[in-house]
Amino acid sequence: MSIIVVKKEEQAQGSFNNGAILENKPIGFPQDNGVQKAYSNLFYWAHAYSTEGSTIGLHPHKGFEIVSYVLKGAIKHYDTKYEKWLGVESGGFQVIKSGSGISHSEELEKDSEIFQIWFDPNLNESLNKEASYADYNSEVLPIEINENRSIKTIVGENSPVKLDTEGIRIQEINIKKNFLLELDSNYSHSIYVIQGKVILNDKQIEKDDFAIVKKEMEIQINGEIDSKLFIISSPTTPSYTTYINS
């Protein structure tokens, strides 16, 4: 049984364009100074936000599966394959399968906030695939509602989003009452608090804190009404050698 908590102040920090875009990183790059590095097949996770709006210029990616979830506002994406700007609004999701190589530019509009997460889909295979891009509006992502919580499934059962990375499930949970969440004990469950305060078993976390739950079959979630969690479940030990373990 294991619950690791990474407070916001323990996470790596980043910025672009003289602070026009700011980041806290629950999972930092290997060279970053935050306490949590890559594990499972999660390589990187940033929470990025901008009050004024800003664009990150064209830059390359290879191999990794890079997803962005819009928490607030909107983002735009341009890449060297499709050669046009495409937009995603609040609640939407975009997937870049960078494969053998693609360059892209990204814009956060004014007062926007996103997660950007890099998954390791098995680079031995992905580097030999053609790059691709897809995006999904919030309306196509299924939501299950009961008296205790609503669960939006971004990746997983009944979602149109398909990732190459093994065993990934992504959900956004809005808490109405305290409830028990069933878990797969063979998976690592990575939890970011989007808003509010919650207690996971006996661990208290609040907005922008991060927790990793391992070797648990269930977890008690007690939270303020309308607290919101973003949860990624991933195999604790993937069936392939990841970049970080190569």
Predicted regions span which residues?
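Jelly-roll (double-stranded beta-helix
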Residues: 1-246
